[in-house]
Amino acid sequence: METLQIAGKTFESRLFVGTGKFASSDLMEAAVLASQSRMVTVALKRVEIGRVEEDDMISRITRHPEITLLPNTSGVRSAKEAILAAELAREALQTNWLKLEVHPDPRYLLPDPIETLRATEELVRRGFIVLPYVQADPVLCKHLEEAGAATVMPLGAPIGSNRGLKTREMIRIIIEQSRVPVVIDAGIGAPSQAAEAMEMGADAVLVNTAIAVAEDPVSMATAFRLAVEAGRMAFEAKLGSVRSEAEASSPFTSFLNLK
């Protein structure tokens, strides 16, 4: 299976995971390790500047050097707030990597396309590696790519909804047109949905809620790992074409012509 490249960095896993909603830090760490993810997100709103080393959840991730910690700006409502949060994250966590989230609507948490694009342009100018969470809008994704985004991260469904790939047709267009990795972010609620995204040609998926709220998060993390691997392998193997009519896999012609 091909490795994933983002901003010149190689990732052996195409499953990214989040750290929210877990019942404990122990359970979160166990699930992350079971997932074999190499990119793990953490919300900036829970990072206390100057006391990062005392944060149990962050330390559980940073003690595994093979994992890249990806701070996210969840909770900001504008480009201005996102830029401030990004600079604080860079100071606190010593990283230029950033998952950009700008969603002013607290009910549906849908990303603001205008503020996201504005923030991306400025953050790229400041040297950040920006992975923006966006609506599944092919035109917006091209603008973000042109602005210097390292990936585009279109949603499958609203954050935490577990509703799957409700935007699949737009995602297909984004994958077809994109020259940067496409990471499906938000809404994936089952391993089968992650596999479908990978079969479509997505470069990676990000999963949090579906793992964290499962009765057995560690086993669910393993299931997502296997599903992502299977979906990617199927994509690389090239799926057969879809037909409207039946086609026998073992034609009877020779058998019927036997003398």
UniProtKB/Swiss-Prot annotation:
It comes from the Bacteria. GO terms for cellular component: cytoplasm. Pathway: Cofactor biosynthesis; thiamine diphosphate biosynthesis. It catalyses: [ThiS sulfur-carrier protein]-C-terminal-Gly-aminoethanethioate + 2-iminoacetate + 1-deoxy-D-xylulose 5-phosphate = [ThiS sulfur-carrier protein]-C-terminal Gly-Gly + 2-[(2R,5Z)-2-carboxy-4-methylthiazol-5(2H)-ylidene]ethyl phosphate + 2 H2O + H(+). Its EC number is 2.8.1.10. Keywords: Cytoplasm, Schiff base, Thiamine biosynthesis, Transferase. The keyword Cytoplasm applies. It is found in: Cytoplasm. HAMAP family: ThiG (MF_00443). Belongs to the ThiG family. Homotetramer. Forms heterodimers with either ThiH or ThiS. This is Thiazole synthase. It comes from Porphyromonas gingivalis (strain ATCC BAA-308 / W83). The gene is thiG.
